[in-house]
A protein has these predicted regions:
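Conserved HGGG/HGGXW glycine-rich cap/lid loop of the alpha/beta-hydrolase fold
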Residues: 9-63
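Beta-loop motif signature
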Residues: 327-353, 398-427
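Active-site loop/oxyanion-hole signature of alpha/beta-hydrolase fold enzymes
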Residues: 41, 45-48, 55-95
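Aromatic- and glycine-rich peptidoglycan recognition patches
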Residues: 384, 390-392, 453-455, 459, ...
Length: 595
């Protein structure tokens, strides 16, 4: 058995795995009245596949002595710091559950120098009224002995080395601290500067009612929170596989000082992954791994690092050699995964360009050039070509589809497709009110000239152009709602807004929240064509999540694709109107303008 003397107590500990050069160990802290083994015996051996794992009994628990017969989170946190140092480590990845989560949190605040990363689970930063009310009856020794036979037997068995009736003192000492400490303010938490992941089950009866996990994550700078749905107090037991994945991923992303520096840089410069993935990591052995979008981002990574990596294994998705392509069909779904059953995240229209990052059988992972969105498309929808060919084709486009759907025929006068509104096309020639369009792959389709508008006559974002385009998009009233949709086959809210502006030659970000951030703030009454944004407050931190956008028609009236009507429809801010909707009025977050 292994013991180490720390702050006058003999601390018993077990270890799993092997020490790895340059890598901080994982230090697991058990919960109230438990021991290291009773709390962590399932996950510790699994974590040991990748880490050296230290599992102690806290002072006064199991085999660890309690010479002063005391119990306080600050004393136990001092023991954590002392044990880490006594075992020859500068820092550790400190993970604690329940009261152990509190100890981990106190260690984080009071002894940050021994923290590499910190994962408090089911912890509380302050003593909420429900704890004062609920905990004393639960931790009453007589109640435990009389009503909780399994817990009673466990207490005797786990803490027998400290005396036959020691368990009674332990539960009384424990509950006294639970209803007294910790008491950290937002300002206290704001002073923390170590990587922190807060874990709390959605149904945790101890901590969830007062949202302790969200409170901690809100105020610790750059802290992350994981609140798994349908899970109670012991997340690491209830969903062990997912818990292990989350912990390993967090430590992989933020587990070294260099990786943390890269992570903070990512939050500052590349937080929105929709604009391009930026996920570099530097292992404890100095090897640079992870993924970034392009070579420019790779250069940023190397500049951020103080010391060049021992080896550069960073994956760069788009390089000079990455193939170019043009969308070669009127419409192609862009999906999150290479499956027809996967989420549709957006759509691409014919003639739009993309970089082909990866091909997997019938599917290709692409990044659309016009809005930066990435996803999987059918490989057959792509015309692979050079950048020069892309630029040539797009520069030749001289008409835009102004019909809702322009019927296209082949050279045998057979209807082959319908080309959606706002598609740019290359008209080679025109004869008897029929336009001959050349596709990216060279095929020729015939379309009625009246369904097209020459680019020289395309409306712009002046008052007249906006009015003309508003008249055109109002034809879409009744078109079904379609998640990810950008065409009259089906729109989502931001897809309709983006299509409205793209017809006038303006590219705006794909999603509503991105648009809200990028557009010019409209002061006063929105004008026709301004975009109106909506979103609910996040109850955890009072921030607003923009989730919806509409196109203003002037005054109180607007047009939008929405789930309430499951289609494109009109609504109004006028309380007396039959098309007034309370949610839209209450959650309106302002207008934006693009030019």
């Amino acid at each position: 058995m292994a013991f180490v003397t720390v702050n006058g107590a003999e601390i018993y500990y077990q270890t799993y795995g092997r020490k790895r050069s340059g890598q901080a160990p994982i230090y697991l802290i058990h919960g109230a009245t438990g021991t290291g083994h009773s709390n962590w015996n399932k996950v510790a051996p699994l974590l040991a596949e990748d880490f050296y794992v230290i599992v102690p009994d806290c002072r006064g628990h199991g085999r660890s002595t309690n010479p002063n017969m005391t119990y306080s989170f600050k004393e136990l946190a001092a023991d954590v710091a002392g044990t880490i140092r006594a075992l020859g480590f500068e820092r550790a990845h400190v993970i604690g559950h329940s009261n152990g989560g509190n100890i981990a949190l106190v260690t984080l605040v009071e002894h940050p120098d021994v923290i590499q990363t910190c994962i408090p689970q089911a912890a509380n930063a302050w003593v909420s009224p429900d704890l004062v009310e609920k905990e004393p009856p639960i931790f009453d020794p007589d109640f435990i002995q009389r009503e909780r036979s399994l817990w009673y037997e466990e207490l005797i068995n786990l803490h027998a080395p400290l005396g036959e009736n020691y368990w009674r003192d332990l539960v009384l000492l424990t509950v006294k601290e639970i209803i007294s400490e910790p008491n950290y303010t937002p300002a206290d938490l704001a002073g923390v500067n170590r990587p922190t992941l807060m874990i709390q089950g959605e149904l945790d009866r101890v901590n969830a009612p007062y949202k302790h996990g969200q409170f901690i994550a809100r105020y610790i700078p750059a802290a992350e929170a994981w609140i798994p749905k349908g899970i109670a107090h012991t997340v690491h037991d209830e969903i062990m596989t997912e818990w292990l994945e989350r912990v390993r991923d967090f430590i992989a992303r933020r587990g070294t000082d260099a990786s943390e520096k890269l992570y903070r840089y990512r939050l500052e410069r590349h937080q929105d992954a929709r604009k391009g993935i930026f996920d570099p990591r530097l292992n404890a052995d100095g090897v640079l791994i992870g993924t970034v979008l392009n070579e420019e981002m790779q250069s940023e990574v190397l500049k951020v690092l103080d010391v060049p990596p021992v080896e550069n294994k960073l994956k760069v998705l788009i390089t000079k050699e990455t193939p170019w392509a043009l969308i070669n069909r009127p419409l192609e779904d862009v999906r999150r995964k290479p499956s027809i059953l996967a989420e549709r995240v957006s759509q691409a229209r014919m003639g739009e360009s993309a970089r082909v990052i990866e091909t997997n059988g019938d599917w290709s992972l692409v990044r659309l050039e016009h809005d930066g969105y990435s996803g999987w498309v059918h490989s057959a929808s792509l015309h692979i070509c050079t950048e020069s060919q892309v630029r040539t084709f797009q520069s030749q486009c001289n008409v835009i589809v102004s019909a809702v759907l322009a019927e296209a025929q082949n050279d045998e006068d057979v209807l082959v497709q319908r080309i959606p509104f706002a598609t740019l096309a290359y008209r080679m020639n025109e004869k008897e009110a029929v336009s001959f369009l050349q596709l990216p792959d060279g095929r020729i389709w015939k379309v009625r000239s009246q369904d097209l508008t020459p680019l020289e006559n395309r409306p712009t974002t002046n008052e007249d152009g906006i009015k003309r385009t508003l008249d055109l998009i109002q034809r879409f009233c009744g078109v079904p709602y379609l998640w990810g949709g950008r065409t009259p086959y089906g729109f989502d809210c931001s897809g309709l807004a983006g299509t409205f502006y793209s017809f006038m030659g303006v590219t705006i970000p794909r999603d509503a929240d991105q648009q809200h951030f990028a557009g010019e703030v409209v002061e006063g009454t929105p004008a026709p064509g301004d975009l109106l944004y909506f979103g609910e407050k996040n109850e955890d931190d009072d921030s607003v999540h923009i989730s919806h956008v509409a196109v203003s028609l002037g005054g109180d009236l607007f047009l939008h694709s929405n789930g309430a009507d499951w289609g494109t429809s009109y609504n109004s801010f006028d309380l007396s109107s039959r098309i007034y909707r309370k949610w839209l009025h209450e959650n309106y977050r302002g207008a934006r303008r693009f030019r």
